[in-house]
Amino acid sequence: MAKESSFDIVSKIELPEVTNAINIALKEIQNRYDFKGSKSDIKLEKEELVLISDDEFKLEQVKDVLISKLIKRNVPIKNLNYGKVENAAGNTVRQRATLQQGIDKDNAKKINSIIKDLKLKVKTQVQDDQVRVTGKSRDDLQAVIAAIRSADLPIDVQFINYR
């Protein structure tokens, strides 16, 4: 087996799934008794979620509803970075959550060090917002996948282009 095998480690969020989860969460918020008459809303602005509600307690409830819907749609909630709760217009509070797409340099270094610690015959390359792993043995590549899945990374990762 002279041919090398490879796969890419990426961190992606499917934006259509996020939109679907927001729509389902908004329907639930409109129908829930404890949200009657409140100004609760969820908006998607490019790659940022904006949560708006009357007070911090209701904002946390909106966040819980949204997270439950995101989980049902298989959207990784590890990739949501929440900002501070801030006051908004009309006696409401707002919180922004950025959707992290891609693997940044720090997390790429963590992934690289996890792979190096395995001491397998594989090579890694950081390419923009993904990490490519190549090796001659498919068993080594599967061991790398298992090690990265078991590692406690601050972002959710997917494995694509397994060749």
Curated annotation (Swiss-Prot):
Note the SUPFAM superfamilies from the entry: YajQ-like
Kindly state which keywords UniProt assigns to this record, in alphabetical order: Nucleotide-binding
Q: Which classification does the entry list for the species?
A: Bacteria, Bacillati, Bacillota, Bacilli, Bacillales
Q: Which InterPro entries match?
A: DUF520 (IPR007551), UPF0234-like_C (IPR035571), UPF0234_N (IPR035570), YajQ-like_sf (IPR036183)
Its protein name is Nucleotide-binding protein Bcer98_0876
One GO MF term attached to the UniProt entry: nucleotide binding
Gene3D superfamilies (alphabetical): 3.30.70.860, YajQ-like, domain 2
A GO cellular component annotation here is: cytosol
Member of which family? Belongs to the YajQ family.
State the Pfam families in the record: DUF520
Highest taxon of the lineage: Bacteria
